[in-house]
């Protein structure tokens, strides 16, 4: 089986803050300054790479963090904000018979991600 690592591009100015944020947010171990692993060895690894160009548009893809139930959504969002994330918006809608409840945030490097409740 292949090992999956997700690489996050960062500026030199926010590299440390972004890596520290995701380590704390996911409970990952920081094995190198630019590399995080899941202590259980189950979830994808995260790598951080310093790039010279600034982020100028919305991500073409993003990470969704799922909580176990709707009651956990708001506390999880507060926890991530305390770690340095910023809330962009919250959505609670019914689409094609499914209830979508999620909050979109950005990490300290400006990368979008969502905290979602199961539908």
Describe every region a protein language model picked out.
Residues 1-19, 61, 116-119:
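N-terminal beta-strand motif that seeds the catalytic metal site of vicinal oxygen chelate
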Residues 2, 57-59, 97:
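Residue-level preference for beta-strand/loop junctions
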Residues 4, 43, 50, 79-81:
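Macromolecular interaction modules
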Residues 8-9, 34-39, 74-78:
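N-terminal start-of-chain detector that recognizes signal peptides
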Residues 14-29, 80-82:
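Amphipathic alpha-helical segments
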Residues 15, 63-109:
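Vicinal oxygen chelate
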Residues 22, 46-47, 90, 102, ...:
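Bulky hydrophobic/aromatic packing residues
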Residues 26-61, 67, 108, 112-117:
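Conserved short beta-strand elements that form part of the metal-binding/catalytic scaffold
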């Amino acid at each position: 089986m292949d090992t999956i690592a997700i690489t996050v591009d960062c500026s030199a100015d926010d590299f440390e803050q972004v890596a520290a944020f995701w380590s704390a947010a996911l409970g990952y171990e920081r094995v190198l300054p630019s590399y995080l692993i899941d202590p259980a060895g189950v979830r994808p690894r995260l790598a951080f790479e310093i790039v010279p160009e600034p982020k100028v548009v919305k991500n073409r893809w993003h990470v969704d963090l799922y909580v176990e139930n709707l009651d956990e959504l708001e506390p999880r969002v507060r926890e991530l904000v305390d770690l340095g994330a910023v809330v962009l918006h919250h959505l609670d809608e019914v689409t094609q018979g499914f209830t979508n409840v999620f909050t979109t945030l950005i990490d300290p490097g400006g990368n979008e991600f969502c905290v979602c409740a199961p539908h």
